[in-house]
């Protein structure tokens, strides 16, 4: 049917011309509408019937497509006379759809959809009156027209399922008017939210970029638990057939029942990394989605090592992966290995060959690459011959690269016959030399999912094209078939996560190792001081959608700052010390001051610092010639000392004769309560200890260091010379007891974490993130 004819027919359903043209671009909806029009025949499609057919066509899933004529008939006969009834019919048919050619109980269908049920205006009025009287009258009298009447509507619809929503809303409005009368001037004013009122007892909340993102993104949440419970809507265990694209066979119903009997109806997920590198920030999203979804639904999550590439796997990667999963706060239900199933996978490969669904092929690896590789000349090789050759592959009788086992299936993107097994004469870290044939990802992944009764196989979007082979393989073997769900990958700007390229950075001595704090591996983020909670919250803010996400590091840092702001105790540190001698020091000897760890919440703990006549402030907190708006110490401007109760003023400036640099200030002090209030207070230390402080910035200059258009010279040419600097800082002695990975806020500077290079006599700190910039701070 020509495009113009279809547009005209779509308009006859009740669409605008623009809507009809947009619909034509959707091949699936167009197909459903064409079939619907054919099924409707000469029936009159007016009074909204046509748009109900359109609604059905957009919602119809492949599992229920066979029932399209039935749905059209019920719509045309006005048995399904609103979208609510159409949706109920689709849901009911989907439940029946796990069996092929399922016989539909029409009486049950009509009951489920409320066919013939008429809710009269009198019923609606009586129900609304009863609900308001029983549950809402007091609140209405108190809040008047500011009350959210949607609560009443939901309550009434819960009792009168098939009542027309507009009629219910109208009845509610009438009852509220009868109760309250006309709106007053106060009713017309916007309501002040409770959380808008200032609270003296609590500091003003800081709105961070991360918080803004979480608020703005409807698919995000503040925590993983909230995200998985409120924003993610996957199928229930055992209802795999409801998922889009799920393939139903004559065995599906039986297999799902057996699956539910084994799992007890619990959610089963898995996190299946390859143990050939260190996990990075993108993996953190995968960990949170898989473990988080299971935890939110009282399920279990496996940690499964996809160890099918023996030449790339190392023991240190196995250990590091487990360590990072646990660091993020998750405990695997079981730790498994794809190699645990090598024997079963081999036996299933033999089954495929016997069914004529797999064959031994001798095309070289380079012949299989590209968009249109030549079809295999061995595709129709006799089953007995493939069985014999596959056994020869297993016994090491065929050279590496001389043969593969391929599956007879075409993937979604058109790729034909993916490889299931290849020959590798390499010892495996777990199975030793037992095997010289190893299964591929395409073959292994879905079968291990099936063996572990995974309910939700959650993976990134690039695996969507493998979904067809995933379902095909499970169904070809007649085993339980999980559901694969894809979500968008998380990418970080100004960063690299490629294992090969990070290894290059290490060998070129640009970074020190996989845990260099300038990287975005999880070990690096931990070393830099990022709390696991912050990484988890950041992943929650990103949501679970099909869109690929690329964010700046500042967004992750904002989530880190949110957590550290309430968990990192404060300490006084100066990075570039300037000596200050208080000539009228008000005490005969050094004094101990008790300082709160969290000034805004003193009840959370305190620590002691020493105040003596010689202190050190930041060099940047003194200026000989201050510019306009400068607020800190200057020859004619005093400054307060944080926590000391003193205000100091400059009396004398001591300079290095050789360089002219200021090396000491001689100051006088006044008690803060007697002095004129200074414009600023600065941090200081006295009788300090020394720290090595490593200050980190972005490693790369450009947002996409791998993009040849942005960085023609390659990522190695894009390294920032200022990505790391080291200073010797002075700190109060309370930091003497700090342990590796302890986190602190150095007041007015930023958040810092104790580095593993720390020893008994040498404290090393990494800057985690700076403080939020305060506009106008001078």
Swiss-Prot record:
UniProt keyword annotations, A-Z: Aminoacyl-tRNA synthetase, ATP-binding, Ligase, Nucleotide-binding, Protein biosynthesis
PROSITE patterns given in the database record: AA_TRNA_LIGASE_I
Homology family: Belongs to the class-I aminoacyl-tRNA synthetase family.
Molecular function terms, GO-annotated: ATP binding; glutamine-tRNA ligase activity
Lineage, opening ranks: Eukaryota, Metazoa, Ecdysozoa, Arthropoda, Hexapoda
Residue numbers covered by motif 'KMSKS' region: 496-500
Species: Drosophila melanogaster (Fruit fly)
Residue sites binding L-glutamine per the record: 306, 441
Protein name as annotated: Probable glutamine--tRNA ligase
InterPro entries per UniProt: aa-tRNA-synth_I_CS (IPR001412), Gln-tRNA-synth (IPR004514), Gln-tRNA-synth_Ib_RNA-bd_2 (IPR007638), Gln-tRNA-synth_Ib_RNA-bd_N (IPR007639), Gln-tRNA-synth_Ib_RNA-bd_N_1 (IPR042558), Gln-tRNA-synth_Ib_RNA-bd_N_2 (IPR042559), Gln/Glu-tRNA_Ligase (IPR050132), Glu/Gln-tRNA-synth (IPR000924)
């Amino acid at each position: 049917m020509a495009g113009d004819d279809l547009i005209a027919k779509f308009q006859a359903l009740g669409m605008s011309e623009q809507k009809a043209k947009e619909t034509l671009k959707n091949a699936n909806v167009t197909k459903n509408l064409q079939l619907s029009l054919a099924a409707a025949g000469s029936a009159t499609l007016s009074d909204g019937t046509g748009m109900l057919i359109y609604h059905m066509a957009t919602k119809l899933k492949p599992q229920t497509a066979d029932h399209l004529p039935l749905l059209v008939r019920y719509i045309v006969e006005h048995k399904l006379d609103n979208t609510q009834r159409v949706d109920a019919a689709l849901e009911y048919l989907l439940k029946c759809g796990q069996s092929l050619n399922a016989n539909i109980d029409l009486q049950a269908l009509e009951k489920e959809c409320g066919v013939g049920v008429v809710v009269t205006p009198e019923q609606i009025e009586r129900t609304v009156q009863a609900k308001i009287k029983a549950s809402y009258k007091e609140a209405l009298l108190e809040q008047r027209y500011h009350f959210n009447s949607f609560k009443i509507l939901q309550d009434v619809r819960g009792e009168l399922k098939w009542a027309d929503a507009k009629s219910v809303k109208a009845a509610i409005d009438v009852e509220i008017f009868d109760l309250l009368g006309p709106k007053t001037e106060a009713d017309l004013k916007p309501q002040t939210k409770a959380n808008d009122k200032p609270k003296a007892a609590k500091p003003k909340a800081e709105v961070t970029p991360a918080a803004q993102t979480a608020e703005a993104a409807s698919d995000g949440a503040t925590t993983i638990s909230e995200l998985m419970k409120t924003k993610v809507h996957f199928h229930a265990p055992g209802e795999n057939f409801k998922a889009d694209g799920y393939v139903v066979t004559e065995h599906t119903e039986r297999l799902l029942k057996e699956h539910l009997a084994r799992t007890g109806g619990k959610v089963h997920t898995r996190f299946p990394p390859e143990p050939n590198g260190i996990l990075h920030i993108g993996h953190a999203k995968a960990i949170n989605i898989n473990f988080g979804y299971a935890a939110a639904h009282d399920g279990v999550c496996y940690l499964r090592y996809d160890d099918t590439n023996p030449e790339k796997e190392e023991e240190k990667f196995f250990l590091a992966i487990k360590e990072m999963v646990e660091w993020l706060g998750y405990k695997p239900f079981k730790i498994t290995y794809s190699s645990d199933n090598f024997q079963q996978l081999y036996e299933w490969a033999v089954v495929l060959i016997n069914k004529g669904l797999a064959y031994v092929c001798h095309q070289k690896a380079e012949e299989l690459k590209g968009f249109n590789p030549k079809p295999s000349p061995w595709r129709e090789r006799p089953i007995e011959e493939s069985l014999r050759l596959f056994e020869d592959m297993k016994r090491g009788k065929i050279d590496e690269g001389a043969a593969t086992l391929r599956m007879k299936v075409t993937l979604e993107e058109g790729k034909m016959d993916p490889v299931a097994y290849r020959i590798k004469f390499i010892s495996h870290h777990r199975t030793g030399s037992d095997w010289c044939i190893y299964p591929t990802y395409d073959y292994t992944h879905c079968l291990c999912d099936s063996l572990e009764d995974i309910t939700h196989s959650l993976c990134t979007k690039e695996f969507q094209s493998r979904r067809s082979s995933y379902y095909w393989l499970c169904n070809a073997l007649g085993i339980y078939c999980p559901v694969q769900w894809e979500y968008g990958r998380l990418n970080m700007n100004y960063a690299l996560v490629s294992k090969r390229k990070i290894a290059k950075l290490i060998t070129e001595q640009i970074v020190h190792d996989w845990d260099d704090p300038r990287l975005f591996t999880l070990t690096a983020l931990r070393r830099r001081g990022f709390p696991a909670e912050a990484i988890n919250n950041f992943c929650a803010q990103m949501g679970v959608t099909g869109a690929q996400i690329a964010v700046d590091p500042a967004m992750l840092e904002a989530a880190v700052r949110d957590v550290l702001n309430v968990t990192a105790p404060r300490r006084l540190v100066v990075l570039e010390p300037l000596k200050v001698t208080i000539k009228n020091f008000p005490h005969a000897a050094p004094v101990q001051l008790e300082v709160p760890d969290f000034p805004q919440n003193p009840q959370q703990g305190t620590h002691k610092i020493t105040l003596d006549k010689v202190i050190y402030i930041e060099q940047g907190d003194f200026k000989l010639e201050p510019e306009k708006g400068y607020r800190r110490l200057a020859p004619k401007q005093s400054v307060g000392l944080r926590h000391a109760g003193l205000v100091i003023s400059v009396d004398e400036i001591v300079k290095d004769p050789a360089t002219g640099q200021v090396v000491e200030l001689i100051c006088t002090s006044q008690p803060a309560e007697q002095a004129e209030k200074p414009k600023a207070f600065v941090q200081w230390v006295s009788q300090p200890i020394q720290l090595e402080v490593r200050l980190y910035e972005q490693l790369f200059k450009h947002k996409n260091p791998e993009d040849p258009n942005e960085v023609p010279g390659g990522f190695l040419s894009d390294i920032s010379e200022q990505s790391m600097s080291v200073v010797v800082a002075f700190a109060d002695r309370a930091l003497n007891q700090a342990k590796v990975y302890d986190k602190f806020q150095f007041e007015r500077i930023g958040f810092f974490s104790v580095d593993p290079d720390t020893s008994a006599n040498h404290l090393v700190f990494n800057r985690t993130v700076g403080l939020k910039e305060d506009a106008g701070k001078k």
